[in-house]
Amino acid sequence: MNKQNLINQFAQLITEQPNPLSVNLDQMSALEIVQLMNKEDQQVPLVIAKALPEIAVVVEKIVAAFRQGGRLVYLGAGTSGRLGVLDASECPPTFGVNHEMVKGIIAGGEQAIRYPVEGAEDNQQAAIVDLQAIQLCSKDILVGIAASGRTPYVISGLKYAKEIGSFTVAIASNPQSAMAKIADIGIETIVGPEILTGSSRLKSGTAQKLVLNMLTTASMVLLGKCYQNLMVDVQASNEKLVDRATRIIMQATGCERAKAEQTLTQADNNAKLAILMILMDLDKQSAVDLLAKNQDKLRQTLD
């Protein structure tokens, strides 16, 4: 694409437009700046509400993929890539899943999580290399994330994923984006111009984070990774999480702390197992076997 075409393309992006409410940003007080930011941020959930039907469809696709041994893979550059890495990294401790189930890939690799990597988002071949490195396959779901909706790295990844039969999703903050036209489904979060012109780490980034929260949380809930509203598959790997697991057991069973602590120890810090052991008066192995017969779903096991 020649320079003039690029200029024209960028000029049409909502995320690159100036926000009329912040033209005097450099003359505002600290309070005025944060008040304006807060006012603008309040629009984000309202925008996402319009995309909930598409988000729910994607959640159902993710659950189906997980049940068939597939993975959820996020692909992005800069802020978008970092948010994907962040959401993926939170899944193992929160839901007790392995680190391969949800993966975040960022243009420029691990270094780009902390530092900008020049030209990384424009490297189309790198996206293919990165996806081949994790052996992306037709069972997986690829979610491309970019506020602009036209990041070359992400577009290349989406095209490659479609070629090999993966279900593809595009999350963008510009309407009718190039990414959305390629993907099987687009989630558009049109939050409007940022108060700091072009700084899509602000409202656009907030919108992306909220959508990613929904994708993984709703998917894991539907997989049986919670009971009531309790994260029963939490990995009790430090003092705070051991205490949380203990309180989860107490809430789910109504037992005293001493009983919860004792059973959690017997269950090797597995809160879900401990709850089942208490409610059905089972030993650990019997609880393990019963859960396995019920797809590891505590509600289904108890019913």
Swiss-Prot record:
From the UniProt record, give the pathway where this protein acts: Amino-sugar metabolism; 1,6-anhydro-N-acetylmuramate degradation; Amino-sugar metabolism; N-acetylmuramate degradation; Cell wall biogenesis; peptidoglycan recycling
Catalysis: reaction(s): N-acetyl-D-muramate 6-phosphate + H2O = N-acetyl-D-glucosamine 6-phosphate + (R)-lactate
Give a yes or no for keyword Protein biosynthesis in this entry. Answer: no
Q: Name one GO molecular function term.
A: ether hydrolase activity
UniProt cross-references to PROSITE patterns, sorted A to Z: GCKR, SIS
Reported EC number(s) for this entry are 4.2.1.126
Keywords in UniProt for this one?
Carbohydrate metabolism, Lyase
Q: Which Gene3D superfamilies match?
A: 1.10.8.1080, Glucose-6-phosphate isomerase like protein, domain 1
Pfam family name, one: GKRP_SIS_N
Domain SIS intervals: 62-225
Location of the active site: E90 (proton donor), E121
Can the keyword Lipid biosynthesis be found in this entry's annotation?
Answer: no
Q: For this UniProt entry, which segments traverse the membrane? A: none
Residue stretches in coiled coil:
none
| Record-level GO BP terms | 1,6-anhydro-N-acetyl-beta-muramic acid catabolic process; amino sugar catabolic process; N-acetylmuramic acid catabolic process; peptidoglycan turnover
Family named by the database record: Belongs to the GCKR-like family. MurNAc-6-P etherase subfamily.
Question: Do you know which NCBIfam families this protein is assigned to?
Answer: N-acetylmuramic acid 6-phosphate etherase (TIGR00274), PRK05441.1 (NF003915), PRK12570.1 (NF009222)
How the protein assembles, per its UniProt entry?
Homodimer.
Function of the molecule? Specifically catalyzes the cleavage of the D-lactyl ether substituent of MurNAc 6-phosphate, producing GlcNAc 6-phosphate and D-lactate. Together with AnmK, is also required for the utilization of anhydro-N-acetylmuramic acid (anhMurNAc) either imported from the medium or derived from its own cell wall murein, and thus plays a role in cell wall recycling.
Q: Output the HAMAP family linked to this UniProt entry.
A: MurQ (MF_00068)
Q: What other remark does the UniProt record contain for this protein?
A: A lyase-type mechanism (elimination/hydration) is suggested for the cleavage of the lactyl ether bond of MurNAc 6-phosphate, with the formation of an alpha,beta-unsaturated aldehyde intermediate with (E)-stereochemistry, followed by the syn addition of water to give product.
Q: What is this protein called?
A: N-acetylmuramic acid 6-phosphate etherase
